[in-house]
Amino acid sequence: MEPIQKMDSLNNKEGQPDKKRKKHESEKEGENEVLEIDVTKPVPPSKKLMRKLRKAGKIDKDGNWTPEALEEAKKKEEKRLKRLDAKYGRKEEGESQEESKRSPWGIWVGNLSFHTTKEILTDFFVRETSEMIKEVSEENIKPITTEQITRIHMPMSKEKRFQNKGFAYVDFATEDALKLALQCSEKALNGRNILIKSNTDFSGRPSKPANTLSKTASIQSSKKEPSSILFVGNLDFETTDADLKEHFGQVGQIRRVRLMTFEDTGKCKGFGFVDFPDIDTCMKAMELGHNSWRLEYGEDRSKRMRNKSPMARSGRFNDAESLGQEDKPNFKRARKIDPRSVRPGAALAKAQRSSAAIVEPAGQKIKFD
């Protein structure tokens, strides 16, 4: 038996390897290696996306973009940049900086046709000023040229495409060109007599109402009586409790800040309440004020009363007006009940019930005739 066991052990060593074999040196080295990822590089596309792109013919078998796909992506990027230029009014590369600059000699042009363009307006000033000088026959004065018009700003309508809003701003390079342009007012352009005013002429504007009330007078003109609660309105949606505490903390201690917020976003609804420990501190906060916030005294809950009837407010017998008022009958009409809707047995449900127990004998004999 011993030689057979020795042969088995030799077969395990030389022939077939044991189950618990040693790992290869390359596997040990692979375990010690660390995978490095470059965060700056773009994320590689997934296998699903690569299959879609390969079926669409945008990439080849090696995963490289085809020339047709690159040309299509370039056109899309150009369209996107054009939309941004149209939306935010970005200047094109070929446009000179002199055309985009404002000058001190500018005019406002109103009552324009909605289909008037910048080119039509430029031709109008060149044509009208040249005809004006021919009529006067003065050699010293020169008409307006396209080079003297440095800027034309014509706001476009958002609702209707390719239509202006009916007015424009034009800047000139010289003061003489400005004077000639002002003389073109009330002249026809596209069937309308346009109006031209200098950018420094503010006549015709309604005068702003002068606020002659001081802070004290404005506080006294408040409809509500002073209280320890201050209502703050016209707040920005990004306003927080810390902003109110920082502003009103200058006058003294703040008991509580109640900022009304939306349930879904948690942002401010535009108003809130600030509670102070006393009325004097609240009045100081009212005098402090704010440039954009609307401040008003709040209503104290402890002093809040429900609206009562005039008889309950004034007293029934002491007020002459309450005596003249007739008392209205306070009764309710009986509810009509359909006898067909009454449940069986409900009619006798409230009837007096007699006891079914044995009656105790009282010593009297009952006779039946």
Curated annotation (Swiss-Prot):
Alphabetical GO biological process terms: rRNA processing
Assigned keywords, A-Z: Nucleus, Repeat, RNA-binding
CDD domains xref list: RRM1_Nop13p_fungi, RRM2_Nop13p_fungi
Compositionally biased tracts (Polar residues): 209-219
Protein name: RNA-binding protein rnp24
Gene for this chain: rnp24
Record bears the keyword RNA-binding: yes
Matching Pfam families: RRM_1
Comp. bias regions, Basic and acidic residues: 325-341
Recorded GO MF terms: mRNA 3'-UTR binding; poly(A) binding; poly(U) RNA binding
Low complexity bias: start-end ranges: 346-357
Region called Disordered, residue ranges: 1-77, 200-219, 304-369
